[in-house]
From Swiss-Prot:
Main subcellular location of this protein, as a coarse class: membrane
Protein name: Outer membrane protein P2
One BP term from GO: monoatomic ion transport
Organism per entry: Haemophilus influenzae
Bilayer topology annotation: Multi-pass membrane protein
One GO term describing the cellular component: cell outer membrane
Similarity section: Belongs to the Gram-negative porin family.
Pfam families registered for this protein in UniProt: Porin_4 (PF13609)
Entries under InterPro entries matching the protein: Gram-neg_bact_OMP (IPR050298), Gram_neg_porin_domain (IPR033900), Porin_dom_sf (IPR023614)
Functional summary from the UniProt entry: Forms pores that allow passive diffusion of small molecules across the outer membrane.
Signal peptide: 1-20
GO MF term set: porin activity
Subunit: Homotrimer.
Cited PANTHER family: OUTER MEMBRANE PORIN F-RELATED (PTHR34501:SF2), PROTEIN YDDL-RELATED (PTHR34501)
Length: 367
């Protein structure tokens, strides 16, 4: 019997939780280990400044490992610690397979109650991370973090007490600071002060959001204001000071057809230091369709525009399609491709066009 798309999506979340192995469970304490190894073989082509480039690769695709410890106090109260790593290329050396180093992606603690919500502190996802509905495995054409940061060093509150509704708010703190002063400070280090935030990195920010996903309806919206550190020694014109951004999604599931259609969008206004402000927006219709049991077809299109008053204008059109298939409850294979074209217009220069095409075949093994 054919499953509905809603059941598949719920099943996907359940499967991701089931992939974790419970290594300890006693007296209200539960410890889980899990993760995945993911490999992709890809071919990419790009045209930048009329120069064509082409390369193929076999590389790691966001392989990860996580550990989660949950302690239940009773009466619905709990505390949780979570650590998730990523495999990435070494900072030094020439390896490009992304298997060089292990880094910390998320690390946070949570205090919560099933009825009243939870407070999360540490390096974690924000409410903006789950707002849009577009599906992708590797070549996602949406750049949500350009509009609102989707993760960082944060204090966050999330409420899930109403079925299908998630409410959240996050306060972002600086995550990248000079470790040393003087010339040892690195970029801009001549006048660096130990402990100061790196120029053009997040200084602080706030965001709020809500998402509803029930009764075949998906609706979500998030707003964020993010402040960026200016160099206290070099007053460069055009450096961003603040970004006010919004993200939204609206979708509907045709359960009998196994089809989800959605429309994602975003808007941002960037305030630059003693320079003209920049405005950005995008719209992105998309779909997810169940071809057969354990096989899904998905895609989305994006139109994005960045503009400066009486200045440079940039337009990007991008499209993505993919098919994934579950060989086993813990084995997923997929093929995905994306194409993007960017046109840049400046009053004093000729129009510039850049193109990029990518296609990849991937395999994920969960544990």
């Amino acid at each position: 019997m054919k499953k509905t798309l809603a059941a598949l999506i719920v099943g996907a979340f359940a499967a991701s939780a089931a992939n974790a192995a419970v290594v300890y469970n006693n007296e209200g304490t539960n410890v889980e280990l899990g993760g995945r190894l993911s490999i992709i073989a890809e071919q990419s082509n790009s045209t930048i400044k009329d120069q064509k480039q082409q390369h193929g690769a076999l590389r790691n695709q966001s392989s990860r490992f996580h550990i989660k410890a949950t302690h239940n106090f009773g009466d619905g109260f709990y505390a949780q610690g979570y650590l998730e790593t990523r495999l990435v290329s070494a900072q030094s050396g020439t390896e490009s397979d992304n298997f060089g180093h292990i880094i910390t992606k998320y690390a946070y603690v949570t205090l919560g109650n099933k009825a009243f919500g939870e407070v999360k502190l540490g390096r974690a996802k924000t409410i903006a991370d789950g707002i849009t509905s577009a599906e992708d495995k590797e070549y996602g054409v949406l750049n949500n973090s350009k509009y609102i940061p989707t993760n960082g060093n944060t204090v966050g509150y999330t409420f899930k007490g109403i079925d299908g509704l998630v409410l959240g708010a996050n306060y972002l703190l600086a995550q990248e600071r000079y470790k040393y002063g003087g010339a040892a400070g690195g970029a801009g280090g001549a006048g660096a002060v130990a402990g100061e935030v790196y120029p053009q990195k997040i200084s602080n920010g706030v965001q709020v959001g809500a998402k509803y996903d029930a009764n075949n309806i998906i609706a979500g919206i998030a707003y964020g204001r993010t402040n960026y550190r200016e160099s206290i020694h070099e007053k460069d014109l055009g450096k961003k000071q603040q970004v006010n951004g919004a993200l939204s999604t609206l979708g509907y599931r045709f359960s009998d057809l196994g089809l989800l259609v959605s429309l994602d969008s975003g808007y941002a206004k960037t305030k630059n230091y003693k320079d003209k402000h920049e405005k950005s927006y995008f719209v992105s219709p998309g779909f997810q369709y169940e071809l057969m049991e354990d096989t899904n077809f998905y895609g989305n299109f994006k139109y994005e525009r960045n503009s400066v008053d009486q200045g440079k204008k940039e337009r990007e059109q991008a499209v993505l399609f993919g098919i994934d298939h579950k060989l086993h409850k813990q084995v997923l294979t997929y093929i995905e491709g994306a194409y993007a074209r960017t046109r840049t217009n400046d009053k004093s220069k000729a129009e510039k066009t850049e193109k990029e095409k990518s296609v990849g075949v991937g395999l994920r093994v969960y544990f």
